[in-house]
């Protein structure tokens, strides 16, 4: 234990821990999705228990290494983190929320559920205030850490080590790509809309079309109860243009072309006897 | 999954590398994500080129799997021989070392096994998936009762067994990944076990070794023989040769940056940016106007349970969504297949527009 660690390292450790939890959960869900339907239904029913079991497996890392995976990544650990303290921490952090939520769900009584929601809301508010105090003044990053008097310490003295240019290059490229996308996206979108609109203006209904789909100019899917412009010939779904309140062509909005049902434009069909 | 890329940069940029430890699970998932991005990106590019220049690129588009496996073999072989890692592993600052000896797999059995697991197995798995989809569709159209002959029995056995094999492989991979997170395993995937290698971070000595120029190509190399004119010629050819040797590195580096951009685009579209571009119907839909659609009064005078085609009680109700009328399934299916339009309104239609009503 060299010295107390920074707040930003503790926050990064929490982010990494939650990311590891989601990776493990996604792996298990991926396997369950491949299984037959009755097995998947059983797993869906037992989802909270499965989640607690997975959490317990991940918490074994603290017993063997003295820190969580995220803390180990950030090279920090709690001072005096004994196995007994780890067990108590696990009980308060994982088991107590699971038991209270499960009991309120299984009891079926509305007043217990409502009381549980109130207690949860109060706890969330307390956590938020505690977190704001932590951001302002340091100290313990979560309420459970305050309860158990756990503080994060750096395992080694932080030094200015050799610069990893590969990682910095990737970080710089990531931010450069983000800035390029945010800068050019409006122009790309405007150009794309102009091209699409030009294509749609050329797409008109003619009686020579035999078996092709009539695509709606608004939703780009086959028209449901197609409406056609009386002069311009553009086709749209009834529901798509009904939202425009005045039943006019969405492409020729400046001319306010009225639309009618496509069926009225067609000649009478021949019924099979 | 896309936030894992950001987490890998967070973990690798901050943690000090005082000792050589195994890469974090975020780096590994990010490089696997980059590896799975190569093939769809190239396929999309080839499809785009085939659309504009059919004479040149259509054959490439049709046989994309075979062309891609050749390209992938060249790429991974180059990286395994020169950098001791696959293409995406090198991009994320990792290398492979043999489990027994601790040497890089530049030559020998580890490189062959690495090439098989990196290039061969994805190709085989893709072909097996396509075969499974095709056979499953065939046996759903026909029934299983028409099975006879050894080949058909083998095909049926394959259709039954392949999903279980895939599930087992995925379960093994998940278990190894969890063990890797908990530092109980040095490998995160069964394919690394088959290749006989483990992953490590690159060290500064490795980075210096990559940039080493061969001795006889260095500029300051003294030549003990020859005249001044011969010396100038030799130096010129050394520069040309050094440039040619450096060209694959430059091209592969640019290729890596392009793929990183693809990965970034995938990340952006899976997060908040996609929500800004989505458009949907909002507001209530008003009731339809009461207008006369057809002029045939006998259609409207029918009972609501009659079919407009056969004028009898409907069997297997089917709606035609281009007009909204409901018919017998056999009547409308036959009519649409014959005339390609709605019998009441005349709107163009095909069998894709039939909606079976199960009420």
Curated annotation (Swiss-Prot), chain B:
The lineage of its organism: Eukaryota, Metazoa, Ecdysozoa, Nematoda, Chromadorea. Zn(2+) binds at residues 307, 310, 328, 331. A zinc finger (RING-type) spans 307-346. The three subunits of the retrotranslocation channel (PEX2/prx-2, PEX10/prx-10 and PEX12/prx-12) coassemble in the membrane into a channel with an open 10 Angstrom pore. The RING-type zinc-fingers that catalyze PEX5/prx-5 receptor ubiquitination are positioned above the pore on the cytosolic side of the complex. The RING-type zinc-finger is degenerated and only coordinates one zinc ions, preventing E3 ubiquitin-protein ligase activity. InterPro entries: PEX12, Pex_N, Znf_RING, Znf_RING/FYVE/PHD. Component of the PEX2-PEX10-PEX12 retrotranslocation channel. This is Peroxisome assembly protein 12. Component of a retrotranslocation channel required for peroxisome organization by mediating export of the PEX5/prx-5 receptor from peroxisomes to the cytosol, thereby promoting PEX5/prx-5 recycling. The retrotranslocation channel is composed of PEX2/prx-2, PEX10/prx-10 and PEX12/prx-12; each subunit contributing transmembrane segments that coassemble into an open channel that specifically allows the passage of PEX5/prx-5 through the peroxisomal membrane. PEX12/prx-12 also regulates PEX5/prx-5 recycling by activating the E3 ubiquitin-protein ligase activity of PEX10/prx-10. One of its GO terms (cellular component) is peroxisomal membrane. GO terms for biological process: nematode larval development; peroxisome organization; protein import into peroxisome matrix; protein monoubiquitination. Belongs to the pex2/pex10/pex12 family. GO terms for molecular function: ubiquitin-protein transferase activity; zinc ion binding. Residues 53-56, 129-133, 282-359 are cytoplasmic. Keywords: Membrane, Metal-binding, Peroxisome, Protein transport, Transmembrane, Transmembrane helix, Transport, Zinc, Zinc-finger. SUPFAM superfamilies: RING/U-box (SSF57850). It comes from Caenorhabditis elegans. Residues 1-24, 82-106, 185-253 are peroxisomal matrix. Pfam families: Pex2_Pex12. The chain crosses the membrane at residues 25-52, 57-81, 107-128, 134-184, 254-281. It is a multi-pass membrane protein. Signal peptide: none annotated. Pathway: Protein modification; protein ubiquitination. The keyword Membrane applies.
């Amino acid at each position: 234990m060299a010295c107390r660690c920074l707040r930003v390292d503790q926050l990064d450790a929490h982010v990494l821990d939650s990311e590891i939890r989601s990776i493990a959960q996604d792996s298990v869900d991926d396997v369950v999705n491949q299984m037959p339907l009755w097995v998947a239904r059983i797993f869906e029913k037992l989802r909270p228990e499965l989640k607690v079991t997975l959490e317990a497996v991940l918490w074994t890392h603290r017993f063997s290494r003295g820190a969580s995976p995220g803390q180990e990544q950030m090279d920090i650990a709690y001072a005096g983190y004994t196995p007994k303290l780890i067990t108590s921490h696990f009980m308060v952090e994982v088991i107590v929320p699971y038991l209270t939520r499960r009991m309120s769900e299984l009891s079926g009584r509305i007043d217990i559920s409502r009381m549980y929601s109130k207690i949860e809301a109060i706890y969330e508010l307390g956590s938020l205030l505690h977190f704001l105090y932590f951001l302002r003044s340091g100290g313990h990053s979560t309420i459970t850490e305050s309860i158990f008097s756990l503080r994060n310490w750096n395992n080694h003295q932080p030094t200015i080590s050799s610069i990893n240019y590969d990682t910095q290059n990737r970080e710089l490229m990531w931010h450069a790509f983000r800035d390029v996308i945010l800068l050019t996206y409006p122009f790309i979108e405007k150009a794309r809309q102009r091209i699409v609109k030009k294509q749609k203006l050329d797409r008109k209904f003619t009686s020579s079309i035999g078996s092709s789909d009539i695509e709606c100019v608004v939703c780009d899917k086959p028209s449901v109860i197609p409406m056609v412009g009386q002069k311009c010939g553009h086709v749209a779904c009834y529901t798509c243009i009904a939202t425009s309140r005045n039943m006019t062509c969405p492409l020729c909005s400046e001319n306010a072309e009225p639309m009618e049902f496509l069926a009225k434009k067609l000649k009478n069909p021949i019924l099979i006897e | 999954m896309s936030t894992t890329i950001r987490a890998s940069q967070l973990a690798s940029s901050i943690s000090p590398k005082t000792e050589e430890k195994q890469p974090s699970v975020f780096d590994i998932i990010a490089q696997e994500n980059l590896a799975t991005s190569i093939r769809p990106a190239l396929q999309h590019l080839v499809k785009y080129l085939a659309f504009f220049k059919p004479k040149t690129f259509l054959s490439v588009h049709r046989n994309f799997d075979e062309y891609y496996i050749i390209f992938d073999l060249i790429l991974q072989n180059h990286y395994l021989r020169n950098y001791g890692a696959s293409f995406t592993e090198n991009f994320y600052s990792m290398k492979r070392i043999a489990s027994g000896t601790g040497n890089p797999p530049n030559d020998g059995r580890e490189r062959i096994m690495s090439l098989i697991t990196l290039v061969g197995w994805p190709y085989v798995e893709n072909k097996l998936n396509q075969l499974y989809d095709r056979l499953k569709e065939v046996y759903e159209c026909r029934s299983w009762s028409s099975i006879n002959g050894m080949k058909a029995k083998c095909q049926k056995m394959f259709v039954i067994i392949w999903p279980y094999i895939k599930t087992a492989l995925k379960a093994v991979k998940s278990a190894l990944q969890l063990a890797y997170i908990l530092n109980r395993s040095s490998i995160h995937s069964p394919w690394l076990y088959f290749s006989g290698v483990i992953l490590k971070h690159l060290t500064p000595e490795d980075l210096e070794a990559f940039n080493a120029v061969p001795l006889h190509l260095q500029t300051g190399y003294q030549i003990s023989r020859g005249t001044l004119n011969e010396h100038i010629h030799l130096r010129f050819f050394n520069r040309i040769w050094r440039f040619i040797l450096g060209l694959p590195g430059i091209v592969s580096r640019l290729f890596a940056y392009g793929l990183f951009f693809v990965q970034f685009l995938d990340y952006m579209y899976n997060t908040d940016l996609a929500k800004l571009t989505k458009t949907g119907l909002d507001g209530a839909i008003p009731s339809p106007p009461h207008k006369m659609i057809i002029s045939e009064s006998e259609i409207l005078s029918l009972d609501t349970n009659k079919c407009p085609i056969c004028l009898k009680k409907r069997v297997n109700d089917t709606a035609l969504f281009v007009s909204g009328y409901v018919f017998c399934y056999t009547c409308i299916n036959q009519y649409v297949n014959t005339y390609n339009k709605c019998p009441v309104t005349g709107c163009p239609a095909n069998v894709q527009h039939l909606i079976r009503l199960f009420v």
